[in-house]
Amino acid sequence: MISQSYRILSRISRNNELKKTFLTNLNCKSSSPSIIRSFCKKQNLDENFEYTNKLEVQELKHYIPCYTIMDQEGVVSKPDQDPNFSKEEVIKMYTTMLTLNVMDSILYDVQRQGRISFYMTSFGEEAIHIGSAAALEMSDTIFAQYRETGVFMWRGFTINDIINQCCTNEHDLGKGRQMPMHFGSRKINLQTISSPLTTQLPQAVGSSYAQKLAGEKNCTIVYFGEGAASEGDFHAAMNFAAALSTPTIFFCRNNKWAISTPSKEQYKGDGIAGRGPNGYGMKTIRVDGNDIWAVYNVTKLARKIAVEEQVPVLIEAMTYRVGHHSTSDDSSRYRTVEEINAWKEGKNPISRLRNYMNHKGWWSDAQEKETIANARTTVRESLVNAEKQYKPSINEIFTDVYDKPTPNLIEQQKELIEHLKLYPDEYPLNQFADSKLILKD
C-alpha cells in the first residue's frame, strides 16, 4: 500500500490541494485497495485495473480463438455468415486466385532461367489476398510487404503491370528503380513496397492519422508477416496507432515461417493476436487465413470499426507459406516435404473455394482447364512483350528526387553522361530508351 500511495503522490505532487486531500483520506481511513481506487476514480486518476492486496503472478489464461466458417470441403457452418456473393463475383475471386497461382509458377521458373532477377510466390496464401482486398474500398490506402500480389490484382494491377516491373522496362511504373516484387501504384492507392522489413507499419499509421485529421471516411491497411512482428517498428506502430486512435488495420499474415525461422521460435504466448488487447488495448481478431469467406468477413468488420470508431484493429490470419521464401531460398533445408504437402493438400485455399462453387454448380473441370490455359497464355505473352521493351531512360535515375533538380544533381547527371560517352562499349546502352539521343554530341 505504501508503494501505491507514493506512486499516486508522485502523479499529483504539483497539485498541493489534491495532495492535501489524498493525505487526509489516507490518514483518516484505512489505506485499503478500495480506498485508493475510490480516490483515484474521484480525482480522474483512474486506471483500468483493480488494486489488490493479494500477491499473485499473472500467466496466460486463455487463447484468442480462430474464426472460420467454411471447411475444406467448401461447406459453410453458419449460412447466415456466408457473404452470399453472386455467382459472377465468386467466379471472379476464384479465377483471380487461380491466375495468381499460375503466374507465380511461371515467373518462378522464369527467374530460374535468368530472365528476371528475383521473385516471390504466394502459394497457399491466395485466400488472404482476395478475401481481404474484396472487403476494402478503392479509396483505402494500402501498405504492403512483398507477398500480397493478389491484393493488387484484385484492385486492378494487371499482369502486364506486374511483369513490366519484374523486367524493369520503360513501362514499369517504378521506372526501373526497384527490384522485382516492389510494386506501387497511385491509381489503386498502393504505396510502393520497400525492402527493409516492417518500415511500412509506422508509415501506415502516419497515413491513417492524416486520414483522420482530414476527416476522411477511409482507412489504411498494412500487411506484414509474423516475422516482421519481431521488429521494433512493429511496437512503435502499434503503440502510435493505439495512443492516437488511428483508423489503421494491421493485417498479419502468420504463414508459420519467417524465411527459415519457424513461428515457434519467433514468439511465446498467444502469437501476434495476443499482443493486441492487453499489450495495446487494440481490438483484435484471429482468422483462418485459408478460408476466404472468414477473411472477407473479418476484414469487412475491421474496416467498419476503423472508419466508424476511428480506432486501429489487429488481424492475425493463420495460414502457411507453401512455396520457398523467395527465389533466393531453398526451404527443403529446414522443413520436410510431408509438412508442406499436409498444408497444400489438407488446407488449400483454392480447392476450398472450388468445393464451395461445386456445391452450387457454378464451376466445372472444363472451366478450370480453360481458365488455367488462358492464364498461362496471358502471362507468357506478357512476358515475351515485356522482354522486348527498352529499359527506362538513363535520365530517370535523376528524376522524381526533387521538384526541381538541384545543382549537385544536375552535375551528377552531367558526369554520368560524360562517363558513358567515354566508355560506351562497357555498357549495354542500346537497351535503354533515348540512350542515342542522350549521348549524342
Curated annotation (Swiss-Prot):
Please state the protein's primary subcellular location: mitochondrion
An example GO BP is: branched-chain amino acid catabolic process
Task: List the subcellular locations.
Answer: Mitochondrion matrix
Superkingdom of origin organism:
Eukaryota
Reaction catalysed by this chain?
Answer: N(6)-[(R)-lipoyl]-L-lysyl-[protein] + 3-methyl-2-oxobutanoate + H(+) = N(6)-[(R)-S(8)-2-methylpropanoyldihydrolipoyl]-L-lysyl-[protein] + CO2
Report whether Mitochondrion shows up as a keyword of the record: yes
Q: Where is the transit peptide?
A: 1-17
The UniProt entry, under Pfam families, shows: E1_dh
Q: What is its EC number?
A: 1.2.4.4
Residue sites binding thiamine diphosphate per the record: Q145, Y146, R147
Q: Which residues cross the membrane?
A: none
InterPro entries, A to Z: Alpha-ketoacid_DH_E1_comp, DH_E1, THDP-binding
Report the GO molecular function annotations. 3-methyl-2-oxobutanoate dehydrogenase (2-methylpropanoyl-transferring) activity; metal ion binding
**Alphabetical keyword list:** Metal-binding, Mitochondrion, Oxidoreductase, Potassium, Thiamine pyrophosphate, Transit peptide
Cofactor(s) the protein requires to work: thiamine diphosphate
NAD among keywords: no
Got a GO cellular component term for this one? branched-chain alpha-ketoacid dehydrogenase complex
SUPFAM superfamilies per record = Thiamin diphosphate-binding fold (THDP-binding)
Gene3D superfamilies linked: 3.40.50.970
Residues that hold K(+) according to the record: S194, T199, Q200
The text of the family note is: Belongs to the BCKDHA family.
What does the UniProt record say this protein does?
Answer: The branched-chain alpha-keto dehydrogenase complex catalyzes the overall conversion of alpha-keto acids to acyl-CoA and CO(2). It contains multiple copies of three enzymatic components: branched-chain alpha-keto acid decarboxylase (E1), lipoamide acyltransferase (E2) and lipoamide dehydrogenase (E3).
Q: What else is known?
A: Bound potassium ions stabilize the protein structure.
Describe, as the record does, how this protein assembles with itself and its partners.
Heterotetramer of alpha and beta chains.
Supply the name of the protein: 2-oxoisovalerate dehydrogenase subunit alpha, mitochondrial
Native source species:
Dictyostelium discoideum (Social amoeba)
Starting at the broadest rank, the lineage of the source organism is: Eukaryota, Amoebozoa, Evosea, Eumycetozoa, Dictyostelia
